[in-house]
Amino acid sequence: MDTNFKFTRARLMTSAATGLAMFLAGTNFAYAQEADEADAVVAVPADSAAEKTEGDKDAVLDTVVVSGFRQSIANSIATKRTNTSIVEAISAEDIGKLPDNSIAESLARLPGLTAQRLRGRAQVISVRGLGPDFTTALLNGREQVTAGDNRGVEFDQYPSELLSQVLVYKSPDAALMGQGLAGTADLRTVRPLDHGERTVSVSARYEYADIGALNPGSDDTGYRVTGTYIDQFAHDTLGIMLAFADQSSPTQAERWDSWGYPTTGANNDLLLGGAKPYVESRNLERTAFAGTLQYEPTPAFRTSIDVLQSNFKDAGNLRGIEIPLAWSGSSLRPGYETSDGFVTAGIFDNVQGVVRNDYRGRDADVLSAGWNVQYDFNDKWTVEGDLSLSRVKRDDVDLEIYAGTGSGFGNGVSDTLAFMRTGDGSFVFGSQLDYTDTTLFGLTDPQGWGQIGYIKRPKTDDELHALRLSLTRNFDSNFISSVEFGANYTEREKTKASQEAFVRLANPGTDNFQLIPAEYLLANTSLDFIGIPGQLSFDPFRLLNSGLLVQDSNGNNPDVLLKAWQVNEDVLTLYAMANIDTAVDGIPVRGNVGVQYVETDQSSSGPANNAVGVTISDGVKYSEVLPSMNLSMEIADKTFVRFAAARTLARARLDQIAASGGLPGVDTTVALRLLASGGSVDPSDSRSIVLNGSGGNPRLRPYIANGIDLSFEKYFGSSSGYVSAAAFWKGFDTFVDPSSSAIIDYSSILSSLTLPPGAESIPNIQLGSVSGPANFHNGSLRGLEFAASIPADMFVDGPLGGFGVFSSISFTESEVTPDDQTTPQAIEGLSETVGNVTLYYEWAGFEARVSNRFRSDFLGEVTGFGAGRELRNIKGDSVVDAQIGYTFHDGALDGLAVQLQANNLTDEEFVTYLNDDPRQVKDYQRYGTTYLLGVSYKF
């Protein structure tokens, strides 16, 4: 992927984007809030504002009478304005109602942020061009583990209905624990005492996928129900919040997956090697609870307990025909058509397709709990303690079962298949066979793969314990307002393993073929989207448990062994931070300056994939000093310049740290030479290395970056008007090359190796090389961000004043080149251009809005062969959502709201491609539009 950004083009696009933002910009998200919600500025009723004294004006900041979506905007912009850091955030429009159906969708509308979709829904985010692994997640300020294989947060684990705010720090401060290199997303639930009144809110939504139910027995409808109860007791010293969210959401998709593209003919034209087109029907079922207990018996003592528990199930069937073409025994007829070096149409003979009935599922349990205690010794000193747990247990299953006309290529009836490439890069076919014929197709091994099917059961456990202690000293000073210092200690353990087995016929007979009994058959599945009328269908799990099939373990396969690992991280963070509140030449200046000292003990263990029963283990200890500074200067009325500088880190991907790999080979020649000369292994001299292996690198150091941010913000008009421009730069002191080599310690498996006699006495012989990820020290990232929020009530009164627009656009470039290479390396998650536009209207209870978020091509992580994770080029997309609703504010229906939403209104596809060539489409997935009709009631 070309990551060289052209700032000439950027300036042109910026000019256009700024003009567009001034005219067509609006937001359905909220911006920033500081760590203490008491400092947040929110829109309040006019009577509350009138009661404020002159001394309260600085805290109120242009309160206006708004509600719903506009209240969300006003709250956000007010807190962005008062924050000392460079931040973005989302605020709930009302209890249990964030602006979008998912957290990730709302985050993707923030300036400089974007999302990657999975099965049609936004799942993980990138912040300022850096992928999901560079952004950490907190829940109420506490670090969270992840359901994925690595560090990237899958935000669909957290129901948006249970959250009141999501704050994204683009520039950290020293008191922010668990901070990411790109950004830190802090998910927040309601504080019942801060909420200040009894509230009961319930909602229900009906969901419909317009693409239809593509697999027999699947659903294209679903639901979401939520409820929240907030109350205060004992003269407002005890507060409670209880929330519940349950959903059953269908996902229907037409999927095209190519094998790849070899070349053919004298001109080396690209030709489809094979394909796996499917229709996929899944159902996401999630049940979640959240609770908060706040107790403040005296003004000096405060304590709270937070708990969030979520069970997440996402499972369903994929049915399609795997079509081996150029990479099989099939033959391409002469006379095929080509265009621009690509074979676009032709006919294959002797095609033996694999009719597949697959099942894929995920079951994840999320638990987050925390206890916080604060005590004021006096008006100068405050002590705080916080104890927390974050845990995710995930179990996946991936089952595939095959049907065909005969076992092994050349046996059974073959097909003659015409093909034609479509304008979107996928293909359609014309078949001579009837793939629904239950007298022709049976359980077998059509391509001679040695199996009737395969089953994988990956399992991941991730758990983190944290303890934080801090002490704050307040000052009556015109420069330093307070100083905070403290310590944070975390222990994290993540493990992964996979149980896998071949699926074979229990009684294969002589032909390894079994017609499917009628009681296991389902209605046929249509494959019209690829030109094939249909295929036979059955329930793969019911068939697996029928006695017709058996499972044959594949646990000792080297590829399976490599999927098992354990990573442990113990991290001690000491920090100190001074908060600044002063004036310089009459200009108000607020901010902070501080430093973190981070000490990490990192270790990993995992099996050797070429020696059953042998475990490799290694690790490293390291420390880093991370200074930070944030300054906010109000250079004119409602006009701010912000400056931030920080050194940040992001620990490497867990699968890169994982110790699992092959037993190293022994270079006998080098060992004998060192024995003869009395020499020792010198890790800096490859000629003296005796042991050479491959796999992960438990000694991998983190990504380290020095960053500078500069932002200009002008606020005007009502509480929801502003424009901003920001520039940022990060220089990487340390980066990770996934395909390099490094030195690790093989002491744990030295006794399992066959060494020349006496070689174990060679000094440092245990230090050997591993081919895999390694650190290098070169790279940078920089970008520009522009945003504007323009409410129409700046210009007109009355109903027309209900219009508003928000737009943002970001341009980012990177230049990251490994030490031993000359070509820059693409950064995961980096789209050179990211933007969004939202137009909204709200007046007298009626509201409507339409939003478009877009991003250019990028390198993203997807699930690859064998359920492993791999990086792939992903085509940029442009997603349009819309919603309309009405809220009753008086009468018998006061508090009742109805809403209709449409997600992915233009049916934007998800596309990946190979070899930096957009013509070589790997995945093409179409999801259709999802509609939600809902009603909510608050009292």
For the regions a language model picked out, list residue spans one by one.
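Short loop/turn motifs that connect adjacent beta-strands in outer-membrane beta-barrel proteins
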Residues: 176, 192-199, 234-238, 300, ...
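C-terminal beta-signal and adjacent terminal beta-strands/loops
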Residues: 803, 854-861, 886-939
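Transmembrane beta-barrel wall of Gram-negative outer-membrane proteins
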Residues: 217-330, 334-336, 361-378, 629
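N-terminal periplasmic "start-of-domain" segments of outer-membrane beta-barrel proteins
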Residues: 65-98, 124, 132-135, 142
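Outer-membrane beta-barrel signature, preferentially recognizing the C-terminal barrel domain
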Residues: 358-366, 563-569, 649-724, 729-732, ...
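Short acidic/polar hinge/loop motifs at secondary-structure boundaries
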Residues: 142-170, 220, 227
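Extracytoplasmic beta-strand/coil segments of soluble accessory domains associated
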Residues: 104-143, 170
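Gram-negative outer-membrane beta-barrel transporters
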Residues: 727-736, 740-741, 747-863, 936
